[in-house]
Amino acid sequence: MNTFKFIVISSLLALLCCILTSCNNICGNKLLKQITTSDNKYTAIAFIRDAGATTAFSPQVSLFKVGHNLTDSDTGNIFIGNNSDFIDIEWKNENTLIIKHKCPKEEIHKKETKLKNINIEYIKLDDNN
């Protein structure tokens, strides 16, 4: 009887471990562009977040202090859109970031105009650009 209990408990623990390890974050980020301010303080990162077959691509932009590397757990702290795989960024000057996107207004979930001492401007492109 003790052998049977051991086998059952061991099997249940193995199954639980398999379930827990398969519940990893299924989202991934694809880096599109990374640009640094001329004073080398901040890095703007444009990326596409993909959370699997049942979700749309999400163009996102984050601003970090120089030295941060994009991870799959990062989400946009400046801009988050939906249903597009296009996003572009450029520095207008040391304190102004320009974000170009193709997201319709109703598909924009985050759109900051200032973060830290960085002003953020947006250019909405149509699908033909």
What are these regions (language model features)?
Residues 1-10:
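Bacterial N-terminal signal peptides that target proteins for export
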Residues 10-18:
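Bacterial N-terminal signal peptides
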Residues 22-24, 81-129:
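Acidic, small-residue rich beta-repeat scaffolds with periodic aromatic anchors
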Residues 23-72:
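N-terminal export/targeting and maturation segments
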Residues 8, 42, 51-53, 68, ...:
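Generic "edge-of-domain/loop-turn" microfeature
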